[in-house]
A protein has these predicted regions:
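Mid-chain, well-packed structural core segment of small domains
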Residues: 104-105, 109-128, 137
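Cleavable N-terminal export/targeting peptides
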Residues: 1-29
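Repeated loop/turn-to-beta-strand initiation elements of outer-membrane beta-barrel proteins
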Residues: 58-61, 108-110, 152-160
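Outer-membrane beta-barrel "beta-signal"
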Residues: 170-181
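Glycine- and aromatic-enriched membrane insertion/assembly motifs of diderm outer-membrane
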Residues: 24-107
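Extracellular loop and loop/strand-boundary signature of outer-membrane beta-barrel proteins
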Residues: 36, 82-88, 130-136, 161-163
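Flexible, solvent-exposed coil segments and beta strand-coil junctions
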Residues: 26-33, 128-129, 151-158, 181
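Transmembrane beta-strands of outer-membrane beta-barrel proteins
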Residues: 33-37, 62-68, 96, 112-118, ...
Length: 181
């Protein structure tokens, strides 16, 4: 009996979700361009600017986008040892990446999205101790990873966004604004 009730509840929920999703007009038709700016945290602080172009719309209650992103991150730390010896280190990362996302339209104003990023990243790090010794190094590498986030639009062309992203070079958590053109 419990299995039958659970099956019935799941069927009704999926039917209600299907009817609600069909009633939502696609807020991101093909050809829409979304421009965003974000501030990032963890680790350190950073910023990113991205652009997404809607390539395919009305696909399984959502849309596919392709675009690009520039991001920067800085973080550092000071360590003090028990014997009084201390040192500082810092990292600066910059990357340019292509991104592709799938956005699921929950309502006409609210979207959940996930995607992938890949590109090239540049890092510079260094350390310095109290005696004046220091070292700096740089590297160039491939960045790749994934992202997941949400967007909420207050008007048809302005909204806010939050993303969790890992690419090896940029901030992991981002919040910002988006403009739909």
């Amino acid at each position: 009996m419990k299995k039958v009730l659970l099956l019935l509840a799941v069927a009704l929920l999926s039917l209600a979700t299907s009817f609600k999703a069909q009633a939502i007009e696609d807020p991101n038709p093909k050809g829409t361009f979304v421009l965003g700016a974000q501030v990032g945290f963890l680790p350190g602080v950073g910023a990113s600017v991205f652009g997404d172009y809607v390539l395919v719309d009305k696909w399984w209650k959502g849309h596919f986008t392709v675009g690009g992103e520039l991001f920067f991150r800085h973080y550092g730390r000071t360590y003090a040892e028990l014997d009084g010896y201390s040192y500082k280190y810092s990292y600066n990362d910059f990357a340019f990446a292509a991104r592709a996302t799938y956005g699921l339209n929950i309502t006409s104003k609210f979207e959940v999205h996930a995607g992938v990023v890949t590109g090239v990243g540049f890092s510079r790090w260094g350390w310095k101790n109290v005696e004046g010794n220091h070292s700096h190094e740089s590297q160039v590498g491939v960045c790749y990873g994934g992202l997941a986030g949400v967007r909420y639009f207050f008007t048809p062309s302005f909204g806010v966004t939050a993303e969790v992203q890992y690419s090896g070079y940029g901030p992991y958590t981002n919040v910002g604004v988006v403009f739909k053109m």
